[in-house]
């Protein structure tokens, strides 16, 4: 049974990588029709705050259930590396499901299909990461001092802080009573159009490096594929919307792309 589930977790990780590539191609073709790109006549729109909270919850609930030993004792969570890595995952999704939605100002309705896809992914990936770390991931006794873990943990923290700060910048572009869109200023937005996405990609690449597993890297690959296409869409939109948009700004990676 354990061998079969371990094989399943590896297969799901490789599938997540493949799905990331598929999503990249599809989103390049059709774009991401939610948020500012959603049609005003879209049917079955869900309130933004409620949609964000519910769609992200599986990635918070499943690790918590793993910690509680629901279904099977969390055999590997008696090891510090496993606990810290799972905590990284938990902290991110606690912020995304319990804090971020309630900071949203206004927010266009979320199309039902976008909500369902996000909910399915958070369930899929939440199971993959939490089950692997709680039951199967084995690390050396000195893993906490390994350069991969230290570097990855630092990148995770830096990426999360960039993501949170960039979201704060975006929320405060408009003063009370103002409507419409503005050019983001400050922080990494001085260099790239999608600083919030860059932060999240750095965060999960750091997590992947610290976990040193196909499960962790699958999440990082999927995140990059989805967010980079969204960043390209933003970058193009900004240039079309604002004649004075800074020409030197890159899409998502400072000074490069």
UniProtKB/Swiss-Prot annotation:
Its EC number is 1.3.1.22. It is a multi-pass membrane protein. It catalyses: a 3-oxo-5alpha-steroid + NADP(+) = a 3-oxo-Delta(4)-steroid + NADPH + H(+); 5alpha-pregnane-3,20-dione + NADP(+) = progesterone + NADPH + H(+); 17beta-hydroxy-5alpha-androstan-3-one + NADP(+) = testosterone + NADPH + H(+); androst-4-ene-3,17-dione + NADPH + H(+) = 5alpha-androstan-3,17-dione + NADP(+). Its main location: membrane. One of its GO terms (molecular function) is 3-oxo-5-alpha-steroid 4-dehydrogenase (NADP+) activity. It is found in: Microsome membrane; Endoplasmic reticulum membrane. The keyword Transmembrane helix applies. Belongs to the steroid 5-alpha reductase family. PANTHER family: 3-OXO-5-ALPHA-STEROID 4-DEHYDROGENASE, 3-OXO-5-ALPHA-STEROID 4-DEHYDROGENASE 1. This is 3-oxo-5-alpha-steroid 4-dehydrogenase 1. It comes from Bos taurus.
């Amino acid at each position: 049974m354990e061998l079969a589930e371990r094989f399943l977790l590896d297969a799901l990780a490789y599938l997540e990588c493949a799905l990331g590539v598929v999503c990249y191609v599809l989103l390049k073709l059709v774009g991401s029709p939610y948020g500012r790109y959603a049609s005003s006549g879209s049917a079955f729109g869900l309130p933004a705050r409620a949609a964000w909270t519910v769609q992200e919850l599986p990635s918070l609930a499943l690790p918590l259930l793993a910690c509680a030993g629901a279904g099977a004792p969390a055999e590997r969570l008696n090891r510090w590396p496993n606990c810290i890595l799972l905590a990284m995952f938990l902290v991110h999704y606690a912020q995304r499901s319990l804090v971020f939605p309630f900071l949203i100002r206004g927010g266009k309705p979320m199309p039902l299909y976008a909500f369902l896809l996000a909910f399915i992914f958070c369930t899929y990936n939440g199971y993959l990461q939490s089950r692997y770390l709680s039951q199967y991931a084995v690390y050396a006794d000195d893993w906490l001092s390994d350069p991969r873990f230290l570097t990855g943990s630092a990148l995770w923290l830096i990426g999360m802080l960039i993501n949170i700060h960039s979201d704060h910048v975006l929320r405060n572009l408009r003063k009370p009573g103002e409507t419409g869109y503005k050019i983001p200023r400050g922080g990494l937005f001085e260099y790239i159009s999608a600083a919030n996405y860059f932060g999240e990609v750095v965060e999960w690449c750091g997590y992947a490096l610290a976990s040193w597993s196909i499960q962790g890297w699958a999440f990082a690959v999927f995140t990059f594929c989805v967010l980079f296409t969204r960043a390209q869409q933003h970058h193009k939109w900004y240039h079309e919307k604002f004649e004075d948009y800074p020409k030197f700004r890159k899409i998502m990676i400072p000074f490069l792309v």
